[in-house]
């Protein structure tokens, strides 16, 4: 893998937005409506990440965390963790640059996310939502020990509603695997 995982900052907004749009345009073809992946996607993702990373979030325990995977000084993947009101931590994004998938970067980011949650939010479950038809991601999360805990409708930018699964890594399972 040879990637370094580090904390992200507002200075990563452009790189993260570019990775996010590129990942969607690769992984979501045939899954989401074409217009959701069109010309405005890059600018929409850039605005989203500039807002997310520049915002004042308040208490440290409630602050989202951006993790960046780098190779040769360039961002090649990222994960974004968001504490939720119910005490769980949402892994809101986990993306790896297309062409680098399958090389351990996603596994390293997920591992770093789980470690961050264990350190900063002891006792909290980590969960994510993934489009049901994103079979490559679904298979990855199942290989990585995620438990399918829900099937629901997900709201995608542009007003699209698509079926998604929720996968959870419980604090209890994490604690057993580290003891």
Where are these regions (language model features)?
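Active-site acidic-Proline motif in GNAT/NAT acetyltransferases
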Residues: 97-99, 103, 132-133
């Amino acid at each position: 893998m040879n990637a370094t995982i580090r904390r992200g900052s507002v200075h990563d907004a452009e790189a993260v937005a570019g990775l996010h749009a590129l990942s969607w345009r690769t992984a979501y073809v045939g899954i989401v409506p074409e217009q959701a992946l069109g010309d405005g996607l890059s600018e929409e993702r850039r605005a989203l990440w500039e807002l997310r990373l520049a915002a004042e979030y308040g208490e440290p325990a409630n602050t989202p965390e951006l993790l960046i995977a780098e190779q040769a000084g360039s961002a090649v993947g990222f994960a974004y963790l968001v504490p939720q009101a119910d005490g769980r931590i949402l892994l809101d994004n986990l993306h790896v640059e297309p062409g680098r998938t399958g090389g351990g970067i996603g596994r390293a980011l997920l591992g770093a996310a789980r470690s961050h949650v264990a350190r900063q939010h002891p006792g909290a479950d980590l969960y994510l939502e993934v489009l049901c038809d994103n079979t490559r991601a679904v298979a990855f999360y199942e290989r990585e020990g995620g438990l399918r805990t829900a099937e629901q409708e997900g709201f995608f930018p542009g007003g699209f509603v698509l079926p998604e699964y929720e996968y959870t890594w419980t604090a209890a399972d994490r604690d057993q695997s580290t003891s």
